[in-house]
Amino acid sequence: KKTALALTERKTRYEIIEVLKAHTADEVVKALNRIEKRLGASFYSVFQTITVDNGSEFKDFEALEKAINRVGNRTKIYYCHARSPQERGSNENANLLIRRWLPKGSDFDKILTRDKVKNVEEWINFYPRRLFKGKCSFVLFQEELALL
């Protein structure tokens, strides 16, 4: 059964959403591999750490951390405490935005396509943020990438 992985960059709140074929650890690793390939060397600076919940899809921390484009690790995985979503606050807020377009309980096998996810991702990343005085995450993320 399809699902989605949402990765929130901490500083700019830039959102990356990947479609997963199944809710498994192997699919999450594949998604991180795709993101690492897409971002290239900047992945290692942008996602120095990733905080995840204690779901079974995140159980293989060694595979999640292992880089595919260089020797060693791509990131460091941290697990939040059980029933402590506030430890992943930015990601939880992003999940609320995602749920506007992909409601919980929806049949993701029918509605979850790469195009649909891309549209949701763009809507979130171009949404003006009060936190950033009306700027959007996309512009801020591009500015941060230019500094790397």
What positions do the PLM features span?
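Short conserved beta-strand segments at catalytic cores or DNA/RNA-binding microdomains
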Residues: K1-I16, K21, L32
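Short, surface-exposed connector motifs at secondary-structure boundaries
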Residues: T12-I16, A41-Q48
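Short, conserved catalytic/metal-binding motifs centered on acidic residues
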Residues: R13, I50-D53, R88, I124
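Active-site beta-loop-alpha junctions of metal-dependent nucleic acid enzymes
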Residues: I17-S42
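Acidic/histidine-rich, metal-coordinating catalytic segments
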Residues: F43-D60, H81-R83
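Short, well-ordered secondary-structure micro-motifs
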Residues: D60-A63, S90
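Short, surface-exposed basic-aromatic patches at helix termini and helix-loop junctions that form
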Residues: L64-N73
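Charged alpha-helix within mobile-element recombinases
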Residues: R74-L148
